[in-house]
């Protein structure tokens, strides 16, 4: 005989339904309440992180469509394979390391794009580069090997991103043709972005390339899972070497030097 749903499950589903139906936007408090009540974050990731009109275009949904079309045109993909994520999407950061931080002029606009061929090419280029980074391969397990800390981070981040089927072009060497093409494509949309009069004028637009939408969903579901763990622990996570992308670290360092 099937068991009746528990009161906890009823409460969890009612909380999710109330926010989905009655909320045009999501506050950091709403997101925290959802994460505390739930263990499956697939719907939350899809509805609030990957779909819908982002905070920066909340009063101008048609202008968001124009922006997506322009990005898609640069990368020769469909507009449906482009979306704004992160703090520019929600109005606050969903990152376990910056949770609740409001989106502001110093914030970057993060864009997800899904050109599968570019993911394959970029990953191949990156691992070919990593093959040449660091000391020569040693087959002696008895010998210790010294590796530059930044090179080790690059290896770890490349493997992490490959597991989640995404590619960060900033990990390629600066003289790499594919890196320069991607950066040129995404930076060329900055003037248009500002011309579309977003809620907040921003300094930089970045992109992360995913192999397919399922990979993007899995990546942001994991972000929510890590955020829930951190909230349960009672605070914001401390950034570690394998948790923060090198380009984010460089941006933070540049800001502190300024």
Model-assigned labels for residue ranges:
Residues 2-107, 114-258:
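Catalytic core of pol beta-like nucleotidyltransferases
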């Amino acid at each position: 005989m099937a068991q009746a749903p528990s009161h906890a499950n009823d409460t969890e589903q009612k909380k999710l339904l109330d926010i989905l139906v009655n909320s045009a936007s999501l506050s950091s408090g709403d997101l925290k309440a959802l994460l505390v009540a739930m263990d499956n974050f697939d719907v939350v990731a899809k509805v609030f992180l990957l779909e819908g009109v982002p905070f920066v275009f909340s009063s101008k949904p048609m202008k968001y469509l124009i922006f997506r079309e322009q990005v898609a045109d640069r990368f020769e993909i469909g507009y449906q394979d482009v979306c704004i994520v992160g703090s520019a999407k929600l109005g606050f950061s969903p990152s376990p390391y910056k949770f609740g931080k409001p989106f502001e002029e110093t914030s970057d606009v993060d864009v997800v794009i899904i050109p599968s061929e570019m993911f394959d090419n970029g990953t191949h280029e990156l691992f070919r580069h990593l093959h040449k980074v660091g000391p020569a391969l040693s087959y002696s397990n008895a010998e210790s090997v010294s590796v530059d800390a930044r090179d080790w981070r690059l290896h770890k981040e490349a493997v992490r991103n490959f597991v989640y089927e995404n590619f960060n072009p900033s990990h390629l060497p600066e003289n790499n043709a594919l890196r320069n093409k991607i950066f040129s494509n995404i930076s060329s949309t900055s003037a248009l972005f500002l011309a579309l009069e977003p809620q907040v004028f921003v300094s930089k637009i970045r992109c992360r390339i995913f192999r397919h939408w399922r990979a993007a969903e899995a990546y942001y579901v994991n972000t929510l899972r890590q955020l829930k763990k951190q909230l349960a622990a009672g605070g914001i996570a401390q950034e570690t070497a394998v948790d923060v992308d090198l380009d984010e670290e460089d941006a933070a360092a540049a800001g502190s030097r300024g």
